[in-house]
Amino acid sequence: MEDEIRKAAEILAKSKHAVVFTGAGISAESGIPTFRGEDGLWRKYDPEEVASISGFKRNPRAFWEFSMEMKDKLFAEPNPAHYAIAELERMGIVKAVITQNIDMLHQRAGSRRVLELHGSMDKLDCLDCHETYDWSEFVEDFNKGEIPRCRKCGSYYVKPRVVLFGEPLPQRTLFEAIEEAKHCDAFMVVGSSLVVYPAAELPYIAKKAGAKMIIVNAEPTMADPIFDVKIIGKAGEVLPKIVEEVKRLRSEK
């Protein structure tokens, strides 16, 4: 693994425009459960009922009860991998973080340019009267076990700005992510199985454009053949080592 860490660091140290793409695996190390896999949430819950737009419109309570069961996880803390990515941005290497996660841990770790393909929990909208709220306005109610209700019209159809099954990705964010993939010289995937489309197309776009490719994941993926550097391991252990090696390489110049 040390040899692969060195290779990844060499790519990033030379990069003028690196992009990081993250999935559920990076947040799993902060205690947020993944959705797929042996211990994934979809083995316990029916996503059609608790995480689809049709299910939400049919029964918003089911969505919020699912969220309440995970409420301790919704307030997780960034882990060393999030901080390492933010450090690479501060060093001028990483120009954008593209994430499939909705937990805002990248921002809390210090990353400034984060493209959230699946939205986030920070804003909520009433589907009936279109009133907009900050998540902070409902935290107290949520912690008491009460589901959000529109303060203006009384509707229970108050939905966070997350992409549920059956909804399209935010088109502007997706466009920006595609542009980043086209123009980067290094593309690093962290904690993604690369099975959810269209997001999983981004590494292929970057590869076609000539970017050097790095993946850090807990297990192999079907996309591994397109990567120049493949590291199997925990992001929270691997990324800080990559950052330290990047700093060492830069100090030698």
Curated annotation (Swiss-Prot):
Alphabetical keyword list: Cytoplasm, Metal-binding, NAD, Transcription, Transcription regulation, Transferase, Zinc
Pfam families noted in UniProt: SIR2
Catalytic activity: N(6)-acetyl-L-lysyl-[protein] + NAD(+) + H2O = 2''-O-acetyl-ADP-D-ribose + nicotinamide + L-lysyl-[protein]
Residue sites binding NAD(+) per the record: 23-42, 100-103, 191-193, 217-219, 235
Binding site for Zn(2+): 126, 129, 150, 153
Keyword RNA-binding: no
Record note on cofactor: Binds 1 zinc ion per subunit.
The EC number(s) this enzyme carries: 2.3.1.286
Cofactor dependency: Zn(2+)
Any GO molecular function: protein-succinyllysine desuccinylase activity
Cellular component GO terms, alphabetical: cytoplasm
Subcellular location: Cytoplasm
InterPro entries reported for this sequence: DHS-like_NAD/FAD-binding_dom, NAD-dep_sirtuin_deacylases, Sirtuin, Sirtuin_cat_small_dom_sf, Sirtuin_class_III, Sirtuin_class_U, Ssirtuin_cat_dom
Location of the active site: 118
UniProt domain Deacetylase sirtuin-type: residue ranges: 1-252
CDD domains named in the record: SIR2_Af2
Main localization (coarse): cytoplasm
Annotated PANTHER family: NAD-DEPENDENT PROTEIN DEACETYLASE, NAD-DEPENDENT PROTEIN DEACYLASE SIRTUIN-5, MITOCHONDRIAL-RELATED
Other comments on record: The two SIR2 homologs in this organism, Af1 and Af2, display different substrate specificities in vitro. Af2 can deacetylate histones and peptides corresponding to the C-terminal part of p53 in a NAD-dependent manner.
Function: NAD-dependent protein deacetylase which modulates the activities of several proteins which are inactive in their acetylated form. Deacetylates the N-terminal lysine residue of Alba, the major archaeal chromatin protein and that, in turn, increases Alba's DNA binding affinity, thereby repressing transcription.
Family: Belongs to the sirtuin family. Class III subfamily.
Name of the protein: NAD-dependent protein deacylase 2
Organism this protein belongs to: Archaeoglobus fulgidus (strain ATCC 49558 / DSM 4304 / JCM 9628 / NBRC 100126 / VC-16)
